[in-house]
Amino acid sequence: MPAQTESKTTTEFKAGVKDYKITYYTPDYKVSDTDVLAAFRMTPQTGVTPEECGAAVAAESSTGTWTTVWTDGLTQLDRYKGRCYDIEPVYGECDQYIAYIAYPIELFEEGSVTNLLTSIVGNVFGFKALRALRLEDLRIPACYLKSFWGPPHGIEVERDKLCKYGRGLLGCTIKPKLGLSAKNYGRAVYECLRGGLDFTKDDENVTSQAFMRWRDRFLFCAEAIYKAQKESGEVKGHYLNVTAGNCEEMYKRADYAVKLGVPIIMHDFLTGGFTANTSLSNYCRNNGLLLHIHRAMHAVIDRQRNHGIHFRVLAKTLRMSGGDHLHSGTVVGKLEGDRAGTYGFINLMRQNLIYRDRACGVYFAQDWCGLASLMPVASGGIHVWHMPALLDIFGDDTCFQFGGGTLGHPWGNASGAVANRVALEACTQARNEGKSLVKYGADIIREACKYSRELAAACDVWKEVTFNFDTVDKL
């Protein structure tokens, strides 16, 4: 059906309700380089056409409302409205469509991820004409992207700060996540760091509870870091979680981390919010702190294939808001993760120029305009047998974040850390020598066991541990 357009400034106002597609479905529209583009997966209600649904999404996420209003005549509607410019069916799915929508850049506040998401996804997901709606991808134009500071430092600066090159980084989340005293917590940190890990981490649940107040934890962790650094000669760190109930308290904790001289802090960016995260990122940039970002609550938003927001969008907006690390799943571990989709979003976290690649779920090319890179963190149910696959999938510019795969070693935390480090270095060396990690990964680990009793013990404990479940959200 040919598009119908209407200029409110030249047409006499008529009260009433009219179809969204009259104004907001514009298949002849030529996308501008300054437009923010969005790809939505739509599932219309029975009897509702995809054109009407796509137009409704464009309207409700920009200038439209459910009825004609006379104040439309006081502005240039054609200048400010969102436009559904293309709709395509989803292959293999019944009654699902991808709607492509263009938004004028004037609709968004500069440097505000909060405003961007409030506009695009803030209200339209509850629209009754849709059974389900999912934001699959965004294209951020260069002129808008340049209003964001992005990550505090980025991968290259982080490696310079740590003086660590040519291999992936290793971390460990301290377990049990809740219940330890600050002193015992610090002891666990020390054992992991002296064994060969680069980082240890507060779990996202750990903030400042009665059994371990934040100030005590910070002190004992700093003591562990300095002791391990002195013994190993390597720079070490612990992700001190500064997430708090208000921003004033968050800054107080970050200030204390600066006074202690530690290299990195942590924030839960979804539960803490984008406004707090952007503010904390700016603080870290100004005070020389690295910022580790945890994605607690993400699966509530991104796991269902038909409704919500894909993680690639969350990763994109986090790179704009700011962070040096971001948890990104593992594919092979205990958490949800599709291999092709994971390739797509770890590339957009690290690279400067991303090309459209529907095989990896990337709907739009994206030029990051030199914005600093974001290091993926592979975390969740991983152990030494996973190391070849992890290195093959993620490459060197990644932090491999163990938990039980370090602390569950039969000889203790330090031995678990040794096993992790030996496995990583063995796989890195084999890859550098031209061996296929996919084909020979298990053989590489077995060969390394001959030279490390700690790795051999770890391999024996976890030789039959797998997480073979079907992926809910896959391409």
Swiss-Prot record:
It is found in: Plastid. It catalyses: 2 (2R)-3-phosphoglycerate + 2 H(+) = D-ribulose 1,5-bisphosphate + CO2 + H2O; D-ribulose 1,5-bisphosphate + O2 = 2-phosphoglycolate + (2R)-3-phosphoglycerate + 2 H(+). The modification N6-carboxylysine is found at residue 201. GO terms for molecular function: magnesium ion binding; monooxygenase activity; ribulose-bisphosphate carboxylase activity. Transmembrane segments: none annotated. The active site is at 175 (proton acceptor), 294 (proton acceptor). Its main location: plastid. Its EC number is 4.1.1.39. Its cofactor is Mg(2+). Mg(2+) binds at residues 201, 203-204. Heterohexadecamer of 8 large chains and 8 small chains; disulfide-linked. The disulfide link is formed within the large subunit homodimers. The basic functional RuBisCO is composed of a large chain homodimer in a 'head-to-tail' conformation. In form I RuBisCO this homodimer is arranged in a barrel-like tetramer with the small subunits forming a tetrameric 'cap' on each end of the 'barrel'. This is Ribulose bisphosphate carboxylase large chain. It comes from Euglena longa (Euglenophycean alga). The lineage of its organism: Eukaryota, Discoba, Euglenozoa, Euglenida, Spirocuta.
